[in-house]
Regions:
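Conserved HGGG/HGGXW glycine-rich cap/lid loop of the alpha/beta-hydrolase fold
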Residues: 6, 11-61
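Conserved acidic catalytic loop of the alpha/beta-hydrolase fold
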Residues: 70-87
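Flexible "cap/lid" loop of the alpha/beta hydrolase fold
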Residues: 104, 113-153
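Conserved alpha/beta-hydrolase catalytic His-Asp/Glu region
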Residues: 150-223
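Acidic catalytic loop of the alpha/beta-hydrolase fold
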Residues: 214, 238-242
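Short beta-strand/loop motif that positions the catalytic acidic residue
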Residues: 227, 233-235
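Catalytic active-site module of serine/aspartate enzymes centered on a nucleophile-bearing elbow/loop
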Residues: 255-295
């Protein structure tokens, strides 16, 4: 489909029943629409699921601008293209930050919001400031710098290392889901434009997250307070990328937000405990359908 002047690749599951609520899934870094395949398979009986490739990721070509605003505008255009009614929006990590921005700036397009460990902090648990700055430098060094760092890396070994870093126990991830993650990483390693997308989008995210701590209308803190749609926040108890303390902080900022902390999981609970995450999402959306006047 075309959205915001760009051809955007989307994947449907659970389609064919107009009575089903429609949900739009937004992935994070080193991901694509395929990232959601395990979760959408569990939800496709209750929802019509649409997972998109963000600009520069998967099969969607690179955009002119990687700012959070520009990415959010593309997601908004996709939401308008897939439905005449507001849709349920679900995002993880970087995709969660974009989904948060979308709900605050385009509430007319969003029926509900589900944030799964959204990226709302620049200070991962256990990292010293020096290490934080080193990580930021490497990720923001530009596509060429990131390509040099990843040159010669094996996709399966790199995926395994990343998942071990992000998850409390990556050994429990379904083998098919792991293979999908490997395919995404392999695609990124082979495609210079994809590495550029990873680097430039992370640089834009870093700028957005820095504004979380500053006053002004563009601060992420103020953006969160503007959200009026029903919101569920799902967070891994052992998230070392964005510690769970930020979940409670974010839940206090978003009016009426409901927080579910998933035990035994890290930054990717939808991969680590898909059944539990699917149940939380399904219950959240069902509650909205059953009590439309109360949400």
């Amino acid at each position: 489909m075309r959205a915001a002047g760009l051809p955007v690749h989307v994947r449907y599951s659970g389609a064919g029943d107009d009575r089903k609520p429609l949900a739009l899934f937004v992935h994070g870094h080193f991901g694509s629409s395929r990232t959601w395949s395990g979760l959408t398979a569990l939800l496709s009986g209750q929802l019509e699921c649409v997972a998109m490739d963000l600009p520069g990721f998967g099969r969607t070509p690179p955009p002119a601008c990687y700012s959070t605003t520009a990415m959010g505008d593309t997601v908004a255009a996709v939401a308008e293209a897939i439905s005449d009614e507001p849709v349920h929006v679900i995002g993880n990590s970087y995709g969660g930050t974009i989904a948060l921005w979308l709900a605050a700036t385009h509430p007319e397009l969003v029926r509900s919001l589900t944030l799964i460990s959204p990226a709302v902090s620049l200070s991962p648990a256990g990292l010293t400031m020096r290490k934080c700055l080193t990580v930021l430098y490497r990720l923001c060094a530009g596509g060429a710098g990131l390509r040099r760092q990843l040159s010669g890396k094996d996709a399966r070994a790199l995926t395994d290392a990343v998942l071990k870093e992000c998850c409390m126990d990556s050994s429990g991830i379904d083998a098919t889901v792991f293979d999908v993650a490997v395919a995404d990483v392999r695609e990124a390693l082979r495609n210079p434009a994809r590495i550029t997308a990873e680097s430039r989008s992370f640089r834009a995210l870093a700028a957005t997250l820095m504004r979380f701590h500053f006053p002004g209308g563009s601060s992420l803190r103020r953006v969160a307070r503007r959200i009026t749609v029903p919101t569920a926040i799902i967070w891994g108890e052992g998230d070392a990328t964005v510690p769970v303390r930020h979940a409670r902080r974010l839940a206090r900022l978003i009016p009426g937000a409901r927080l579910a902390v998933v035990r035994g999981t890290g930054h990717l609970p939808q991969l680590e405990a898909p059944q539990r995450v699917a149940a939380i999402i399904a219950a959240h959306i069902a509650h909205i359908a059953e009590h439309p006047a109360r949400v």
